Amino acid sequence: MGPFSTITVSFLFCLAFWHPDQIGANPVYNAMSNADLMDFKNLLDHLEDRMPFEDEAVPPQALSEQSDEAGAALSPLPEVPPWTGEVSPAQRDGEALGRSTWEASERSALLKSKLRALLTAPRSLRRSSCFGGRIDRIGAQSGLGCNSFRYRR
């Protein structure tokens, strides 16, 4: 390092300590005032009052009327017939014919089995979406890697 670069580094180092407010990190919670937080809370309460609860059954006609009103300002899209709740025979996979909707327990069981199959698939166990292969092995030995459970000894 030459004398000019040493002086420059020293000057920048001193400048960093001279103005800590402009260079240092500021916490996020100071950026919003209590009045702003109260406004957000009131807005959230207002939206919760306007939204129907999940337990209440909303008729499909009311939903289609709401979507028609909301979509009036958008560009015209081709009309899609509303879903009637019926499942095609190809989707039933051997279920009894004549049933128009799936029961909640059947849907949850189907979703659980698909999720379990996805999580236990060998391909998903080999992949790491966090690091490259070499960095993943280094991180696993230090206990900081994404798949550190696979490489423990």
Curated annotation (Swiss-Prot):
Region (Important for degradation of atrial natriuretic peptide by IDE) residue spans: 147-151
Keyword Cell inner membrane recorded: no
PTM comment: The precursor molecule is proteolytically cleaved by CORIN at Arg-123 to produce the atrial natriuretic peptide. Undergoes further proteolytic cleavage by unknown proteases to give rise to long-acting natriuretic peptide, vessel dilator and kaliuretic peptide. Additional processing gives rise to the auriculin and atriopeptin peptides. In the kidneys, alternative processing by an unknown protease results in the peptide urodilatin.
Keyword Transcription: no
Family stated for the protein in its record: Belongs to the natriuretic peptide family.
Organism of derivation: Oryctolagus cuniculus
A GO cellular component entry from the record: cell projection
Swiss-Prot/TrEMBL GO biological process terms: cGMP biosynthetic process; cGMP-mediated signaling; female pregnancy; negative regulation of systemic arterial blood pressure; neuropeptide signaling pathway; receptor guanylyl cyclase signaling pathway; regulation of blood pressure; vasodilation
Region of interest (Disordered), residue spans: 54-101
Disulfide bonding pattern of the chain: C130-C146
Name of the protein this chain belongs to: Natriuretic peptides A
SMART domains (alphabetical): NAT_PEP
InterPro entries xrefs: Natr_peptide, Natr_peptide_CS, Natriuretic_peptide, Natriuretic_peptide_atrial
Propeptide: 26-123, 93-103
UniProt GO MF annotations: hormone activity; hormone receptor binding
Residues with the Phosphoserine modification: S129
Domain of life of the native organism: Eukaryota
Signal peptide boundaries: 1-25
Keyword tags: Cell projection, Disulfide bond, Hormone, Phosphoprotein, Secreted, Signal, Vasoactive, Vasodilator
Marked site positions, Cleavage: R123, S124, C130, F131
